[in-house]
Amino acid sequence: MPGCTSRLLPEGPFSRNQALAVTTAYLNVLIEDDQGTHFRLVIRNAEGQLRWRCWNFEPDAGKQLNPYLASEGILRQ
C-alpha cells in the first residue's frame, strides 16, 4: 500500500529511518543512547519499565525486537 510504513523491523541491523518509522507507529518505542551513527531502540511497558533494547547495528537486532513489538508495542491511534 502506498504511504504505509512497516510496523516491524528487518531481522538484522536497521537504519535510523526504519527506527523512526517504528517510533512513529508505537507510543512506547523510543530511540535512546543516540551517538549519531548508532543508537538503541528501546521498548518500554505501559508503566515505563524497560522490556527490551538493542543497538541498531547488532546482527540480529530486528529479530530480537520484533517479538516485543508484536506482543508489547502500543500502537498510536
Swiss-Prot record:
InterPro entries: DUF905, YkfF-like_sf. Coiled coil: none annotated. Gene3D superfamilies: ykff protein like domains (3.30.160.130). Pfam families: DUF905 (PF06006). Belongs to the UPF0401 family. This is UPF0401 protein ECP_3010. It comes from Escherichia coli O6:K15:H31 (strain 536 / UPEC). The lineage of its organism: Bacteria, Pseudomonadati, Pseudomonadota, Gammaproteobacteria, Enterobacterales.
